[in-house]
């Protein structure tokens, strides 16, 4: 069973998952996000994905996560996003063993691991440097389909400078982020019952064939693969949220 709710951090979500016997995990698709994840005895970080990731959760085991809004996790974790791209890393590799073990034990002992993990994330955010102030505007403009050059101009940056800032915040350049956000926008429409053809044009793709190419390039899946996975019984966290 998968559940999520808004977290007490700007744009973040707290999610919990328990996979039942016989349920099949869905592929996790890129969405520009990063996650702090707990499973009994372990805390790890899921970096920003550029391809789909198939988790291998253990039936009956509880999982909890904080999914950070695009570009906000690096300031909290103290690591540039590009260093974690397409990786799952134990938190003790980033914060040191003693600190990570203490936090893991605190979440292990909590009646509500999701709330305890959220408290860990909020405490880390309170101590962290402020996120890049341009991040939110970059995400909003790219999500709206604005060209990268226009986003750079509004931000007062050259395209190379925007690329560097984007790698640090999101894990990849603005063009890749724009493609990922466009794909997620299209799939969100599909989940609402919109046809692939209509979702493609409404999200900014030229047509359904363009959407299919983007789906294959960014996830390794076909649109038919996605339709089949979406019919599986057990929901999974979107984007970087994963269990392993």
What are these regions (language model features)?
Residues 167, 186-189:
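Enrichment for repetitive, rod-forming helical segments
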Residues 1-150, 155-159, 172-174, 188-191, ...:
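Alpha-helical bundle regulatory/interaction domains
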Residues 166-172, 214-222:
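A secondary-structure capping/hinge motif
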């Amino acid at each position: 069973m998968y559940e999520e709710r808004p977290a007490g951090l700007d744009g973040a979500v707290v999610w919990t998952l328990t996979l039942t016997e016989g349920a099949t995990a869905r592929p996790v698709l890129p969405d520009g996000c990063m996650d702090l994840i707990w499973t009994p005895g372990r805390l790890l970080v899921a970096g920003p994905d550029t391809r789909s990731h198939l988790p291998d959760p253990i039936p009956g085991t509880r999982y909890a996560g904080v999914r950070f809004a695009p570009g906000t996790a690096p300031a909290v974790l103290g690591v540039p996003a590009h260093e974690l791209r397409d990786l799952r890393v134990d938190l003790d590799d980033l914060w040191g063993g003693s600190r990570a073990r203490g936090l893991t034990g605190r979440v292990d002992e909590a009646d509500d691991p999701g709330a305890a993990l959220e408290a860990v994330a909020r405490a880390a955010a309170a101590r962290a440097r402020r996120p890049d102030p341009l991040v939110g505007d970059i995400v909003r403009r790219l999500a709206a389909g604005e060209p990268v050059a226009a986003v750079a101009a509004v931000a007062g940056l050259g395209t190379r400078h925007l690329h560097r800032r984007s790698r640090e915040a999101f894990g990849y350049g603005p063009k890749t982020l724009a493609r990922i956000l466009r794909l997620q926008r299209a799939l969100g429409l599909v989940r609402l019952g919109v046809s692939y053809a209509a979702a493609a044009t409404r999200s900014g793709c030229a047509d359904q064939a363009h959407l299919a190419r983007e789906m294959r390039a960014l996830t390794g899946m076909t649109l038919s693969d996605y339709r089949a996975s979406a019919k599986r019984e057990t929901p999974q966290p979107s984007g970087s949220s994963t269990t392993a």
